[in-house]
Regions:
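Solvent-exposed soluble domains appended to multi-pass membrane proteins
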Residues: 1-147
């Protein structure tokens, strides 16, 4: 990381670098680590289970961008957030994501959080989540296809 940042620090071209790991180790690896610490899945609290799905990230730029520290977010928003902070115009899909983030700051396979901080089941937010899933599918697989 240090070498990469040092290289771009004085570059003339505006540069944004995102350091992000997409998940924690697999269950097989995590089970071994837990066992070596006298723990098992059966004895983890709900909060400890959730921590497995939290991954730190760092956004660095060689110019001033809007910064946010310690924000709870989810991977589906990260690209749109970085582009917005970098001053890059967002396409319609990423604009939609930034709007959705105001209502649901976290959407993941294991938890969905509303703007007020309350956790909800995605299945209980069916209408909004169905729209999101359809748009996400279109963006990933059908982009440019006329239906």
């Amino acid at each position: 990381m240090e070498s990469l940042i040092s290289y771009f620090k004085d570059a003339d071209e505006k540069t944004v670098i995102v350091f992000f790991g997409d998940h924690q180790p697999s269950d097989a690896v995590a089970s071994t680590v837990l066992a070596k610490n006298g723990m098992s899945w059966n004895h983890l609290t709900e909060e400890q289970q959730k921590l497995r799905y939290q991954v730190p990230y760092v956004v660095w730029a060689n110019y001033d961008i809007d910064e946010e520290t310690g924000a709870d977010t989810s991977a589906n928003y990260l690209a749109a957030e970085v582009l917005e902070r970098a001053g890059v115009p967002l396409d319609e899909y990423r604009s939609y994501l930034m709007h959705l983030k105001t209502e649901y700051p976290v959407i993941s396979a294991v938890r969905t959080v509303k703007a007020d901080g309350s956790e909800v089941r995605a299945s209980d937010e069916k209408d909004e989540m169905d729209i999101y899933r359809k748009l996400q599918y279109y963006e990933l697989f059908d982009h440019g296809t006329v239906n």
